[in-house]
Regions:
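PEST-like low-complexity, intrinsically disordered acidic/proline/serine-rich tracts
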Residues: 2-6, 18-345
Length: 345
C-alpha cells in the first residue's frame, strides 16, 4: 500500500471515529443567559417498584437480568391496568377501595384505604416504563444503607417506640400526618402519588417546586455561604453551582425531624447532615438525579441514591391540599378531647 492511500484511509477512519463519538453526545439545551437548561415538569414515577435497598441476594449487581426485567415489566403493566380500569380486578386494592366507598365504609387507619399495602398504581401513579435498577441505593456497591452509629440506633429505637401510640397533643402527631413537609429526599423519592416536580430557572437562581406538599426550594448559584449554624429548617439551606452540565445543590442547616425515605420516613438525620444533589440532563426527556447523604452522627459512612426523573407529556402538577384548609388535625384533637370529657355512665 502506498503512503498517500494509507494516510487517506487513516484520516477517514479518524473522522469516522470522531463522528461516531459526537453522535453519542446529545447537545445540551441552554438558557438565554448560558446555563444548562433543566426547566420543565418532571416526575420520578418510573422508579416506582424499585426498592430503596437492594435485596441481599443481588449482591453488588445493580441491574436486572432480561428475565427479571420482563417480570418487572409485567407488574408495571398490571399497575397501569389498575389505574385505567380499577373495577376490572376484583382483588385489586383499588377495587376494594371503590367497593368500600360504595358501601359507605370508612377507609382503614392511615389513609391508605381498605388495603394498607402501598401498591403502585393504586391511586393513579404508575411507572410508565420498567426500571432495570435493583435498588435506589447505588453506593455503597452492595446497594444497602450503611450501618447506623450508636446515636443513629438510639434515634431509630425512639422512633419505633413512639409509633402508633395515642396522641394527646399536636406534638405527638408525625410530620407526615400534619402534612407539613416530606423533606428534601421525601419530596422526590417516588411513592403512590404526587411524584412531580417543576424546575424554573432565572439568572443566578434555580427554583424547584414539588408536587408533594407543594414545597418550593429557591437555590442561589452565586457562591454565597450557608446560613449560620444555629439555623435549622425542614428543607434546610440549599446553595448550588454548576459542574459542567450538572447542577450541584448542597443543603445544610437541616433540622432533625426528617429521614431519607419515602414521605420523609426512615431514621431521622442529625442537624449536622449535608445533602448533595446532582441534576444532569442526559436527554430531552430525562434528568439523572443523585442524592448523597453525609451524616456521620447517624450513619457510619456516606451513601447515595440515584434514579432518573423524566418529562412525560400531559403530566400536570395539581394543588396538594392534604387535609382541606389544614384543619383536620385541629378538628381531630377537638373531637377526641370532647369524647374524653364526656361523663362516664
Amino acid at each position: 500500500m502506498s503512503k498517500p492511500v494509507f494516510v487517506l484511509i487513516s484520516i477517514v477512519t479518524a473522522v469516522a471515529a470522531l463522528s461516531g463519538q459526537t453522535a453519542k453526545i446529545q447537545p445540551q439545551p441552554k438558557t438565554p443567559w448560558g446555563d444548562p437548561d433543566l426547566q420543565g415538569t418532571w416526575t420520578s414515577d418510573d422508579t416506582l417498584g424499585v426498592p430503596m435497598e437492594r435485596p441481599v441476594s443481588f449482591g453488588t449487581r445493580q441491574y436486572l437480568t432480561e428475565d427479571e426485567l420482563k417480570d418487572r415489566e409485567k407488574r408495571v403493566e398490571q399497575s397501569k391496568q389498575r389505574v385505567e380500569n380499577p373495577s376490572s380486578d376484583n382483588h385489586s386494592p383499588a377495587k376494594k377501595q371503590l367497593d368500600a366507598l360504595a358501601k359507605g365504609e370508612a377507609p382503614a387507619a392511615g389513609g391508605r384505604g381498605v388495603d394498607a399495602a402501598p401498591v403502585p398504581g393504586q391511586f393513579g401513579e404508575f411507572a410508565r416504563r420498567a426500571s432495570r435498577q435493583t435498588s435506589q441505593v447505588v453506593d455503597p456497591p452492595n446497594g444497602r444503607i450503611p450501618e447506623l452509629t450508636p446515636e443513629g440506633k438510639a434515634k431509630q429505637a425512639a422512633a419505633r417506640a413512639n409509633r402508633g401510640k395515642p396522641a394527646t397533643s399536636w406534638k405527638d402527631w408525625s410530620i407526615y400526618d400534619r402534612c407539613i413537609t416530606r423533606g428534601v429526599a421525601g419530596s422526590i423519592i417516588p411513592v403512590i402519588y404526587g411524584n412531580g416536580l417543576e424546575i424554573v430557572q432565572a439568572p443566578g437562581y434555580v427554583a424547584i417546586r414539588y408536587e408533594m406538599v407543594h414545597d418550593t426550594r429557591i437555590v442561589p448559584l452565586d457562591g454565597r455561604p450557608h446560613l449560620a449554624s444555629n439555623v435549622h429548617t425542614y428543607m434546610g439551606d440549599p446553595v448550588g453551582h454548576w459542574e459542567g452540565n450538572t447542577l450541584v445543590v448542597e443543603t445544610t442547616n437541616l433540622n432533625d425531624k426528617m429521614g431519607i425515605g419515602a414521605n420523609g420516613g426512615g431514621v431521622p438525620y442529625s442537624e449536622d447532615t449535608k445533602l448533595t444533589e446532582r441534576f444532569t440532563r442526559v436527554s430531552q426527556n430525562t434528568i439523572d438525579y443523585q442524592l448523597t447523604v453525609d451524616d456521620p452522627k447517624t450513619y457510619t459512612a456516606k451513601w447515595t441514591i440515584a434514579f432518573p426523573i423524566t418529562h412525560e407529556p400531559g403530566y400536570e402538577i395539581y394543588e396538594y391540599a392534604c387535609h382541606e384548609g389544614n384543619m383536620s388535625l385541629r378538628n381531630m384533637m377537638l373531637a377526641a378531647r370532647a369524647e374524653a370529657d364526656k361523663p362516664k355512665n
